[in-house]
Amino acid sequence: MGTNFEDIIRIRSEVERLHLDGWEFVLAVPLDSLLKSYNGTGPENLRKEIREKLDKIAKQLLPAVMVHDLDFTWSDGTVKSFNAANKRLLKNCIICATDAAPWYSWKRYALIAEAWTFYLACKKLGWVAWLSAYHDNRQDKL
C-alpha cells in the first residue's frame, strides 16, 4: 500500500481547507519532498504495516499528522520546538476532529481522545525521534 502522490495531494488539500496551524508551510513544500517527509501515523522506526493500520484508524487526523511530520523533518533539535510541534499536533488534531463530526456525535469525542493520545505519545516517546530527525537534517546539509 504506502503513501503515493494522490494521497499526498488529498491530505495536503485537507491541510489547506482546514487552515491547520502550519498550512502555509505545507503548501510551500514540493510534493516530492512531502512524499519523503510524510510517513503516516507513528515514528519512522515503527513498522510500515503498523503505521498503515494506525492511518486507517485515525484517517480523519492525517492532515495534522502531515504537519507534524514536516515539523520533525525540519527539527532544530531544541526542547522548545519539540514541545511546540507536539502542541501544534494536538491543536491540529482537534481541528480535524471537530471538522469530521458534529459536536453531539460520539465520533467527535473519540477523535478528540485520539488527538490527546497522539499528543501524549509524542510528548513522552518522541524526543529520540526529534533528535534523530535533527541529526539526519544536519547530515543532509553537510
Show the residue positions of the predicted features.
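Extended terminal accessory/targeting regions
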Residues: M1-L142
